[in-house]
């Protein structure tokens, strides 16, 4: 039946076009995220003060929605040098015991109703996304009244979560700034005066003065500490592995000397 075949072809084409139009926005958002450059951050897992501050920020600002269910409160307290009582009084808000996993009270089914999707667990997010991306993402929320939560994000366009650190950072908006001209990957300077050549860019992130509790420098440090904690949480044995690895390398170097002397003793008659 040609009529039935024609209808079938038409329906198939309609479905294909619908799929294309549904997928295109996702590709556009992914491309925009890839094009936005990450700000590099140096994470020092030996800086316990920074890790403690990051743990505090995580507990107070992130654990309302996000769990770290592969991490235990006791392990964090031990690794970061936090006394048990201090940990329980200031960083545990769910009634959990010190040996329990860092879960949250919010149920996934409720989260889907409230947010459209359950917020992801953040235990391994630093390994999945990378510390540079996290550092950039947490600092690039900006006001966007067209979005459900009133904010958007440069590193994650059409983000589906609020800016939970807004009271620390302040109101960040898209505004105009004088930025240095870059050509061929090189910053341009006036050949006569040596001063940077700039132009006005009206797509820059700008924090409205005196709208946040922290200065820009203080906020960047706070985010760095949070990212450091997430990096630790994603691989809590890293420092111990590095310590053991040092001893292993020293042992191998020591063993090599004796192995070489033994080899020379065995082969002296051959040569």
What are these regions (language model features)?
Residues 1-11, 193, 199:
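Short, Lys/Arg-enriched N-terminal segments with co-localized hydrophobic residues
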